[in-house]
């Protein structure tokens, strides 16, 4: 589940590498202070114990998406999908669905279901899915106080050529970003790689919503935008955890929020797609904490 992007010009102190070393060596929580003109932000470096909890939460979130796939079919309502996921998260996994009652106004459901031209934060409802519908299911679970956040695109029946291509390119854009992750890389490098790939296929990147740091809190620093310029933004450090979750439109990039104050749609009603993973920056690259069995990318990527 992404966060609303808040613009801020900031610079990370060059002590970040030292902080990462201290966190790893002494299993101590370190906060990197990020200064902006108007406020102070912080990004947590996870300890060894926290990383293990993040791995557990990530696997559980991925498991929910693997479970729900067989239920995404013609005639089902997104409310029914929400109830199935809720029962599984609470009664089988003994977890907490993070979206439920989150935010202001409180989000009323346990998952987000974003259908066709809905970009993100779609609220499950009683409308039945029909053949050709594409739906993003966004799941976040809390286990032992730590969050795992991931989303996947599903299609009812066979996708149209347009929807199938958009879904594929969006997932490939996510993978392009993931493969960039390692200590020393800057967030602008990742955003640029995603933007360049999506726009090379004549798609647009949603800019109002972004990935985010994650851990004991649902949304932490840093903000991870899916566009940008190389060699800009925060520098990645071993032990950071964050999501990458590009939202890509078949039409123009502009969005609007519906009166429910949650559902975000494309202004031109063009199709939108999104995929999301929770990631850990390792000593040599990245670990995908929410990887599913149906994916063909490695869980651990070393550079």
PLM segments and residue spans:
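Active-site neighborhoods and metal-handling regions in enzymes and metal-associated proteins
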Residues: 2-303
């Amino acid at each position: 589940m992404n966060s609303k992007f808040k613009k801020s010009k900031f610079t990370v102190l060059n002590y970040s590498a030292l902080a990462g070393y201290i966190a790893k060596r002494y299993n101590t929580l370190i906060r990197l202070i990020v200064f902006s003109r108007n406020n102070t932000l912080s990004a947590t470096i996870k300890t060894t114990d926290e990383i293990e909890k993040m791995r557990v939460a990530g696997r559980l979130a991925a498991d929910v998406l693997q479970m729900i796939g067989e239920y995404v079919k013609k005639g089902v309502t997104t409310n029914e999908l929400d109830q199935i996921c809720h029962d599984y998260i609470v009664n089988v996994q003994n977890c907490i669905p993070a979206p439920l009652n989150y935010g202001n106004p409180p989000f009323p459901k346990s998952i987000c279901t974003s259908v066709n031209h809905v970009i993100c934060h779609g609220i499950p409802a009683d409308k039945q899915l029909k053949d050709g519908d594409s739906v993003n299911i966004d799941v976040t679970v809390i286990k032992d106080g730590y969050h795992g956040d991931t989303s996947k695109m599903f299609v009812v029946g066979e996708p149209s050529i347009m929807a199938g291509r958009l879904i594929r390119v969006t997932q490939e854009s996510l993978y392009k970003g993931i493969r960039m992750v390692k200590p020393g890389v800057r967030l602008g490098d990742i955003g640029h790689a995603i933007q360049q790939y999506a726009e090379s296929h004549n798609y647009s990147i949603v800019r109002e919503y972004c990935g985010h740091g994650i851990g004991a809190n649902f949304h932490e620093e840093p903000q991870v935008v899916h566009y940008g310029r190389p060699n800009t933004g925060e520098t990645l450090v071993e032990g950071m955890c964050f999501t990458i979750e590009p939202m890509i439109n078949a039409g123009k990039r502009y969005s609007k929020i519906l009166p429910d104050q949650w559902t975000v749609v494309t202004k031109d009603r063009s199709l939108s797609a999104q995929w999301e993973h929770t990631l850990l920056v390792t000593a040599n690259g990245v670990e995908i904490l929410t990887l599913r069995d149906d994916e063909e990318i490695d869980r651990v990527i070393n550079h």
